[in-house]
Regions:
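Cell-envelope/extracellular polymer assembly enzymes that use nucleotide-activated donors
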Residues: 3-5, 33, 181
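Short beta-strand/loop segment that forms part of the nucleotide-sugar
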Residues: 31-40, 66-68, 96
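A conserved acidic beta->alpha catalytic loop
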Residues: 38-48, 72, 95
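Conserved donor NDP-sugar-binding/catalytic core segment of glycosyltransferases
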Residues: 103-133
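Conserved nucleotide-sugar donor-binding catalytic segment
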Residues: 143-220
Length: 230
């Protein structure tokens, strides 16, 4: 088994996934895999993912594509299936419309080896073609709990975590904010969560994002399971 599996949910992402795949493979160590979960895409998502992993007609063997079983649960369903189909010690995340920056995994893996359970990098927002860097300051495990009570201070597709901590708290759940719900349960279980100051991702901002929807935000706070984690 590889040391690291980076899981990437994708649905009709043909316009962006090639760059997401290429940049992530470029940032990943040799002993790793990038596992794309194709969630019933009706466009050329799979072909574009393969194109992003190809150099000189050769596909990077670290790319693996998994067809996701349809059903309810949204992205949490995809992530759960990808967790079940991988067995690496470390788990990373990536989204199909973002861009990984070089050095991302080297920095986060170093923090894991120093004793953290879950590590994030800071991000640079990509608003159209305009990059907007977020303030590059670190949040230590000692301070993370306070930050989580006030807001979600970390970006899911920058995550690197031990599989052990994710499994210990029950993995992803079918709630509106499956990422924040996981962070809260990890923190409550005594997990060490850190956000590094360094930028590790270009995070694309666009109108269609679910998290920017007011109805989603309302449903998120009303969900009883998520409220219990908080």
């Amino acid at each position: 088994m590889p040391e690291l599996s980076v899981i990437l949910p994708a649905r009709n992402a043909a316009g962006t996934i090639a760059r997401a795949v290429a940049s992530t493979l470029a940032a990943m160590p040799a002993d790793s895999e990038l596992v794309v979960g194709n969630d019933s895409s009706s466009d050329s998502t799979v072909g574009e993912a393969i194109r992003g992993a190809s150099r000189g007609g050769v596909v990077d063997p670290r790319l693996r594509i998994e067809d996701i079983t349809p059903g309810e649960g949204g992205v949490s369903r995809v992530l759960t299936q990808l967790m079940e189909r991988t067995d690496s010690r470390l788990v990373g995340r990536m989204d199909a419309d973002d861009v990984s920056l070089k050095g991302r995994f080297k920095r986060t893996m170093r923090a894991i080896e120093r004793g953290d359970d879950m590590v994030f990098t800071q991000m640079i927002e990509l608003r159209g073609s305009r990059p907007v860097p977020r303030m590059p300051y670190e949040i230590t495990p000692e301070d993370m709990g306070w930050h989580l009570l006030l807001t979600n201070p970390v970006c899911h597709p920058t995550m690197l975590a031990t599989r052990e901590i994710i499994d210990r708290v029950g993995g992803y759940r079918a709630v509106p904010a499956e990422d924040y719900d996981l962070w809260m349960r990890v923190a409550s279980a005594g997990g060490r969560i850190r956000r590094l100051a360094a930028w590790g991702l270009l995070y694309r901002i666009h109108l269609g994002q679910v998290t920017g929807n007011k109805a989603w935000r309302s449903d998120s706070w009303k969900n009883p399971d998520q409220a219990q984690a908080f």
